[in-house]
Regions:
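A secondary-structure boundary/capping signal
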Residues: 18-19, 50, 122-123, 144
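Hydrophobic/aromatic ligand-binding patch that stacks against planar heteroaromatic rings
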Residues: 39, 110, 134
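PIN-domain endoribonuclease scaffold, especially VapC-family toxins
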Residues: 39-94
Length: 155
């Protein structure tokens, strides 16, 4: 994502953060991606969610490996969902590039339906659509988290 793309619209970029990126930002607050939480809470980015992607986040936060009690899960959701814009996915969903993993389709549908500027992911199947580079697919780029953060810092 270039500064020119953001500047043209003169508004914060609309972004889809896949579940693993969100987990890194929320659960691992000392991690490299914790900065994302400050970005959405300050209005520097607009995270997009759909019913399907929000349900996946709720389900994954309940995995035993995270050792999060219901109260902790609610707190983490409260650190994200109030800042997210809910996007309704049409039926049938919009056309998106072919993807090897059908579980990744909700993120592609969300990016296309929500007019996202970026789909931020470390997922190999999603990145393979863009040949592992930040490259525009339809109207949005599929980009690694660190590259996305660098693009914001360079703006």
């Amino acid at each position: 994502m270039t500064a020119a793309r953001r500047g043209r619209r003169n508004r914060p970029p609309r972004v889809v953060l896949d579940t693993n990126v969100l987990l890194s930002a929320l659960v691992f607050s000392g991690g490299a991606l914790a900065r994302l939480q400050g970005l959405w809470q300050s209005g520097a980015i607009v995270p997009l969610v759909s019913t399907t992607t929000a349900e996946e986040l709720v389900r994954v936060l309940a995995y035993p490996k995270f050792k999060l009690d219901p109260g902790a899960r609610q707190e983490l959701l409260a650190d994200h969902l109030p800042w997210a814009e809910v996007v309704e996915i049409a039926s049938p969903p919009p056309p998106v590039p072919a993807c090897r993993d059908p579980f990744d389709l909700p993120f592609l549908y969300l990016a296309a339906s929500g007019r996202a500027e970026a789909l931020v992911t470390g997922d190999a199947d999603l990145l393979s659509i863009a040949d592992g580079k930040a490259r525009t697919v339809r109207s949005f780029v599929i980009v690694r988290p660190h590259d996305f953060l660098a693009s914001l810092a360079g703006a």
